[in-house]
Regions:
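A glycine-rich, aromatic-flanked flexible loop/lid motif
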Residues: 21-29, 137-147, 161
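A generic structural motif
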Residues: 34-45, 153-155
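Active-site lining segments that contact anionic ligands and/or coordinate catalytic metals
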Residues: 7-9, 30-32, 116-119, 144-146, ...
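Active-site pocket scaffolds in enzymes
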Residues: 160-161, 166-232
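Metal-assisted phosphate- and nucleotidyl-transfer catalytic regions
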Residues: 46-152, 174-195
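A residue-level signal for conserved active-site and pocket-lining positions in enzyme catalytic cores
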Residues: 5, 35, 89, 122, ...
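Class II aminoacyl-tRNA synthetase-like tRNA-binding/catalytic domains
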Residues: 1-38, 188, 209
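Hydrophobic/aromatic-lined pockets within catalytic cores
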Residues: 2-3, 7, 17-21, 53-61, ...
Length: 232
């Protein structure tokens, strides 16, 4: 909504979620890097993410020149991050014997079996599992203009082209069984005209895991908070 006034909007801020998972990659409190940009689509957002990751890698390389006790391998600058469609990877997963069907999520255990390493994008997801504000593809109504950034089987970011029309948002909400009246505070803004826009959220702790080789997300933050720990 802020793209009505500001063409580019970003924030780096805490996020909180009632996360029930006890794994090495889930926290109940984390830092998210979020940005939204007007007059772009999800392809532009993926390019922005490439730029962000390469800038971080460049900063790590510069830091390591004066700090020789860095105990992990500094990544190399990426020419480009590979892109796979959801359909491509679903086919590969099914070839391993999995019973996954169109519209199912792609789980870490399944992704690890197909052996893709490093950073890559999974794009053009089915519309079903994606949030109500994600735009439907112009070419195929079953597909959304969305992506996930992965590192091996670890999800780092999710993003999409966003819906900018109120009527389209309301239709999507109805299809998902949502009560439109409870979202009036969100929908009313669209009466004043929202530009076409796209954006994403990047999990900082998970990005640090990918760039440093740290295997447990709790080691990327001073005070990890999860399903079992609230303080400090």
């Amino acid at each position: 909504q802020l793209t009505m006034s500001f063409e580019k909007v970003f924030e780096i801020a805490p996020i909180f979620r009632a996360e029930p998972s006890r794994t090495n990659r889930h926290l109940s409190e984390a830092i998210s890097i979020d940005f939204e940009e007007a007059y772009v689509d999800y392809n532009d957002v993926m390019k922005r993410i490439e730029q962000i990751i390469n800038q971080v890698i460049l900063s790590m390389q510069e830091f390591s020149k004066d700090n020789h006790d860095v105990d992990f391998v500094i990544p190399v600058i990426l020419d480009t991050i590979p892109q796979y469609t959801y359909a491509d990877l679903l086919e590969k997963i099914q070839a391993t014997g999995a019973k996954s069907q169109w519209g199912d999520d792609l789980y870490p255990a399944q992704l690890s079996k197909i052996g893709i390493t490093g950073f890559y994008f999974i794009k053009d997801w089915p519309i079903g599992p994606k949030p109500f504000y994600v735009k439907v593809s112009k070419d195929n109504p079953k597909i959304s203009e969305s992506f996930d950034l992965m590192y091996g089987d670890l999800e780092i970011s999710s993003g999409s082209t966003r819906i900018e029309k109120k009527s389209e948002l309301e239709d999507r909400m109805k299809n998902k069984g949502m009560k439109i009246d409870t979202f009036s505070y969100h929908l009313n803004v669209f009466d004043y005209g929202v530009p076409p826009h796209a954006g994403c959220g990047i999990g900082l702790e998970r990005l640090m895991m990918a760039l440093t080789g740290i295997e447990n997300i709790r080691d990327t933050t001073f005070y990890p908070r999860d399903v079992d720990r609230l303080t400090p």
